[in-house]
Amino acid sequence: MQYKSSASPHLLEIAWEACNQVGGIYTVIRSKVPAMIEYWGDQYCLVGPYVPQQAANEFEPTDDYSDVYGQAVLELRAQGVECYYGTWLVTGRPRIVLINPFSAFNQLGEIKYYLWENHRIPTSNEDLLNQVLAFGQQVKRFISILAQKAQVVAHFHEWMVGSPIPDLRREQVPVKIVFTTHATLLGRYLAMNDPNFYDQLTSVDWQKEARHFNIEPAVSIERAAAHGAHVFTTVSEVTVRECIYLLDRIPDTVLPNGLNIRRFTAMHEFQNLHLTYKKRIHRFVMGHFFQSFPFDLEKTVYFFTSGRFEYRNKGFDLTLEALARLNYRMKQAKSDMTVVMFFVTKQPFYSINPGVLHSKALMEEIQETCEAIKDQIGERLFYDAATSSDHKLPQINDFVDDYWKLRYRRTIQSWKTHQLPPVVTHNLVNDQSDEILHFLRSSNLVNNADDRVKIVYHPDFISPTNPLFGMEYGQFVRGCHLGIFPSYYEPWGYTPLECVASGIPAVTSDLSGFGDYVKKHIKKYSDKGIYVIDRHERGFDESAEQLADHLLDYVEMNRRERISQRNRVEGLSEMFDWKKLLVHYERAYQLALSTSQE
């Protein structure tokens, strides 16, 4: 551990998603904790908003306020601020300060006045913005108190916690400030709405576009934070260009994202996990498809994509086009393989499709009936073997009661249907306008019997409480064969990295931070199970063809080749461990400590 003495710096990491799960930054902060604790020890502390529902599950208050963080919390409370100090209940158990944004809502008028008066940052009455500004004001007070007691490096993540930075600099509070943008706010909006985003990036009028999308206050905070930080960072080389043209500052360094990688000592361990979870996916697939038509599960591969519903940004459009081409090619080649493709995202729905639930219930009834018949046959066969002098195998049907024969027949009769398996598992609120469904219907990729590519669109995240899968998302990933994430806009991209960490091959794109990092730092990455689609230099049609080629190559692998590739992917995961990537963070902190206060 490098920093241990009371004279060495204290690191404060401030994030809206510390002990408050909203999106991907929660994964960044949480997974990094063990490596941060190992390096910084007791001089590391997080700051996040107090959200009672989240805190009830993940926060444990302390009675010990003897360290500098605890003392600063007591002083802040004495000023009338509702704040808590304790432990975040995640791996590493770091110290954390939680501050209730609502305890400063009575000061919002004054906060907004001075933001405009001193920094020309406009505001609105939007609820999230009010919370962010109130939280920021209290964070500024906390840091001002803490900076009187110790040397402090304060690392702010994203615009939601960026509002204190301009005033910390204006008031010359003795703190070294690092600010990280994980994705520029304007970049995300422009990429979703402008097909020529990357070509026109150099000529964007940020203020005009921010007003157009009604996000000028947030973008103004982001820009002020970027310019006010002693050290400005972003998560990938892909977003560096965005920062230059949309925030008007070149990042000082890049902080790539990692994971807390759990390596297996023996290769067969993660292979066994793949088989275990694949069997659970088999069960769902049998219930969903076999009612209409069966196919050979030994010749079936499971592909998936997941993430927030941004049809174009996440590359759902490219994935669908490539799947349609793959289906055509496999049919032309008379392939005996089947691809089941899962789209796991979040869209508004009324309920799970009753037909899907009914099919699952019938499948369970078939299983119960077969188990009962198996038990009855087993017991009677054992008795017959023990008492009979004949060594021939008896007629097994004779050991089944008429009741079970009738129930078996009726169950099978009620099971079979001539309807096609639904492509979507839920009743969507926007069924007619949903972009995934529109593509599937218009291209007739609707689970026809002769389709080699079958679709399961699951508009809800996978969790153990989910009645269709009943498993963790990470278990689902391990049970699949390939993750597909050819994003158009993705500052980093955790989903393919999660695949790699699970030993599952993945498709990414060179427009994502992760894909760009892979191309620049890993030799022969395709051989190691990471396929990078060249979207930067190619148009949509060429990229779709390249993706279809990769998918077909994977389908045509034999089982031994797939296992070998999973071994190579799992071997690659170590280079994305936070213990390897933390050096980038330490470089940023050393850079901040070496800057002058002015």
What are these model-predicted stretches?
Residues 1-598:
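Catalytic cores of nucleotide-sugar-dependent glycosyltransferases that transfer UDP/GDP/TDP-activated
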